[in-house]
A protein has these predicted regions:
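N-terminal pre-catalytic segment of deacetylase/amide-hydrolase enzymes
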Residues: 1-31, 36-51, 66-67, 187-205
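Metal-dependent polysaccharide deacetylase catalytic core of the NodB/CE4 family, i.e.
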Residues: 27-28, 38, 47-154, 159-177
Length: 205
C-alpha cells in the first residue's frame, strides 16, 4: 500500500476483485484493517457510533484468537467483518498452498465471506482459489494512516483528495496507525457528511 489509489494496471490484473462499489451512488465504505486490538478497536467503534456510521473490519486471525470478544462486539454493533489472513501474511511472498492454509485457518475464527489480502498483495493462483470462497475486497483509497512520514492532517487530506462515489476507504485499527487515524477519522467522517456522502458496511455476501 504505497499509493493512495491503486494503479490501473494492478486493477486490470485482478478484475474480479472488488475495488469500488456502486459507482453511481453517493456512498463510501469505510474499512479498518489489522485489528482487532483492545487499545484501538473500541475507540473506532465508539467513534462510528457517535456519527451513526457502519463500516467493515478486516481482521487478522491471531488478533481474533487473542480478543474474540472484540469480533463479537464489532458484529453486535452492526458492522461487517472480513478475513485478513491469520498472521497478516503477504501472498506475493509465499507459495499458494501455505497462503491458503493461513487464510482458511483465520476463517475458522472469523467466519466471513469477505477477504482482503494484506498490503493488497496476491498471486494470481491464490486469487483464483480464493474467489471461489470469498468476495475479495480491495480498495479505492488508502489513507496511509500507518505511515510515519505523514501527519494526521496529511492523512485527512488524502481522504479529501481521493474520495469519490463508491470509494472503499482503508483505515487501520492498529497501534502503528493509531495517532494519525484518531486525528483523521472523525474529521474525515464530518467532511464526507458535509459533502453529502452516505456510509455503508460491505455486506458479508
Amino acid at each position: 500500500m504505497l499509493v493512495e489509489r491503486p494503479p490501473l494496471l494492478y486493477r486490470m490484473l485482478f478484475p474480479e476483485t472488488v475495488w469500488r462499489i456502486h459507482k453511481r451512488d453517493h456512498t463510501v465504505y469505510l474499512t479498518f484493517d489489522d485489528g482487532p486490538i483492545p487499545e484501538v478497536t473500541p475507540w473506532v467503534l465508539d467513534t462510528l457510533d457517535r456519527y451513526g456510521v457502519k463500516a467493515t473490519f478486516f481482521m487478522v486471525g491471531e488478533n481474533v484468537e487473542r480478543h474474540p470478544e472484540l469480533l463479537e462486539e464489532v458484529r453486535r454493533r452492526g458492522h461487517s467483518v472480513g478475513n485478513h489472513t491469520m498472521s497478516h501474511l503477504q501472498g506475493a511472498h509465499v507459495g499458494t498452498k501455505h497462503y491458503l492454509h493461513n487464510v482458511f485457518r483465520a476463517n475458522e475464527l472469523i467466519g466471513s465471506t469477505l477477504f482482503r489480502p494484506p498490503h493488497g498483495l496476491l498471486r494470481w493462483g491464490q486469487s483464483k482459489v480464493l474467489r471461489s470462497r470469498f468476495a475479495i475486497i480491495m480498495y479505492d483509497l488508502v489513507t496511509r494512516d500507518y505511515s510515519r512520514k505523514l501527519t494526521g492532517e496529511q492523512v485527512l487530506a488524502n481522504v479529501k483528495r481521493y474520495a469519490r462515489n463508491g470509494s472503499i476507504i482503508v483505515f487501520h485499527d492498529s497501534l502503528k496507525a493509531e495517532k494519525n487515524m484518531k486525528y483523521a477519522l472523525p474529521r474525515a467522517i464530518e467532511w464526507l457528511k458535509e459533502k453529502g456522502y452516505k456510509f455503508d458496511a460491505i455486506p458479508e455476501m
